[in-house]
């Protein structure tokens, strides 16, 4: 991984939505929902709040759900990533 996020930013590898429904219907690209899940592949160093350094809650390897239109899309080595602020992450999937 050549992306090293700064501050409270997180790099997430996007997990693509299913292309076939449970009923066997193949969805065209225009009908698919924008992905909202991914795996954390890199985290920033944290942020300073009131002069104290606060570490990020998420860590590399966590599966997360994030806001639908959050972050900046980045393509690197044929893979699709999102660069998000930690506050754009809604939940960690356990």
From Swiss-Prot:
InterPro entries: Chaperonin_GroES (IPR020818), Chaperonin_GroES_sf (IPR037124), Chaprnonin_Cpn10_CS (IPR018369), GroES-like_sf (IPR011032)
The entry's keywords: Chaperone, Cytoplasm
Coiled coil: none
Gene that this polypeptide is encoded by: groES
Pfam short name (any one): Cpn10
Subunit structure, interactors included: Heptamer of 7 subunits arranged in a ring. Interacts with the chaperonin GroEL.
HAMAP family linked: CH10 (MF_00580)
SMART domains: Cpn10
GO cellular component assignments: cytoplasm
GO molecular function: ATP binding; metal ion binding; protein folding chaperone; protein-folding chaperone binding; unfolded protein binding
Keyword Phosphoprotein: no
Subcellular location: Cytoplasm
Origin: domain of life: Bacteria
Organism for this UniProt entry: Thermoanaerobacter pseudethanolicus (strain ATCC 33223 / 39E) (Clostridium thermohydrosulfuricum)
Biological-process GO terms, alphabetical: chaperone cofactor-dependent protein refolding
Its job: Together with the chaperonin GroEL, plays an essential role in assisting protein folding. The GroEL-GroES system forms a nano-cage that allows encapsulation of the non-native substrate proteins and provides a physical environment optimized to promote and accelerate protein folding. GroES binds to the apical surface of the GroEL ring, thereby capping the opening of the GroEL channel.
Sequence similarity: Belongs to the GroES chaperonin family.
Gene3D superfamilies registered for this protein in UniProt: GroES chaperonin
Major localisation: cytoplasm
Protein name, UniProt field: Co-chaperonin GroES
Record's keyword annotation contains Chaperone: yes
